[in-house]
Amino acid sequence: DLNVRSNEHARTTYKSYYGPTYYSFNRGDIHYVVLDDIFFIAKSYLYVGYLTEQQLQWLEQDLKQVTPGSTVVVAMHIPTYSREARRKEWGKESTMKVMNNRSHLYELLKPYNAHIMSGHEHYNENYVLADNLYEHVHAPLSTLFWQAPWACDGTPGGYAVYEFDGGKVNWYYKCVGKDKDYQFELYPVGASRNKKEAVVANVWNYDSTWKVKWYENGIDKGEMIRFSGYDPAIYEYCEKNSSTFKHKYLGADITEHLFYAVPETKDSEIRVEVTDHCGNVYTRKMQQSK
């Protein structure tokens, strides 16, 4: 409700149709919590990422019923963390794109093995926040509001799949129309505007526990180097088609799950091997031509 004077009344219509905006339930050995971290500031469409004291008090009491050490899944819209925070560039965080009082949520989740599931941003990102705390930021199936085949970071249209076994959680990203093993894209030398001399891999579900290795003509060359830049496919697509986009502000965005390696020769065979957090290995090959 955009014509109300405060956040307290902004969900009246939603609640009348769908019920509460925060709640919890158990399924199997997992405790699930849904939170509402969009705080409407009663000015146009503007909001900030914020958990009200009412929700924090409720969550504190809710978690008292959960055995310490068990797995808790917490879902919300706006992410708690950001790429700026990971780089310790705190002043560059946008109040509209991150939960501003996240430290108080983290404190409540300390006794548990917690997975935070969020969205909002049109890219895929994962944050290992602590040994027991992990945040999954999900790229939307709609990519760039249905304007492109990829999200702004080059993640193909798709969805996350989570597999629960007792208190254990495994996950992978499933691209629409692609096999489960399609977990990264490999670009040839010259495709990347940031690393023109290198082959580049976009590993969209990467986190710090993954390994990205490369081989040239079968020789192990070690790990590829991670860098920030634009995914070649979405960048080129937006350059060619952005004039037809419904929303003119849409475009490619810099991502941090890119990796590069510079081949020694121009006609070598390149193989990239990606190992995920579960030990699954994904491989792609590319034959270079002079």
Question: Where are these predicted regions, by residue range?
Answer:
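Active-site segments of SGNH/GDSL-like serine hydrolases
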Residues: 70-86
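Aromatic sugar-binding surface patches on proteins
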Residues: 231-260
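Short, well-ordered beta-to-alpha junction loops that form the rim of enzyme active sites
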Residues: 37, 75-80, 120-121, 174-175
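Short, high-confidence coil segments that cap the C-terminus of an alpha-helix
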Residues: 68-70, 267
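Extended active-site neighborhood of metal-dependent phosphoesterases/phosphodiesterases
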Residues: 1-68, 87-115, 123-165, 169
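Short beta-strand edge segments in extracellular beta-sheet folds
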Residues: 287-290
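Binuclear metal-dependent phosphoesterase catalytic core
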Residues: 133-206, 210-217, 256-265, 269-285
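Extended low-complexity, serine/threonine- and proline-enriched intrinsically disordered segments
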Residues: 210-235
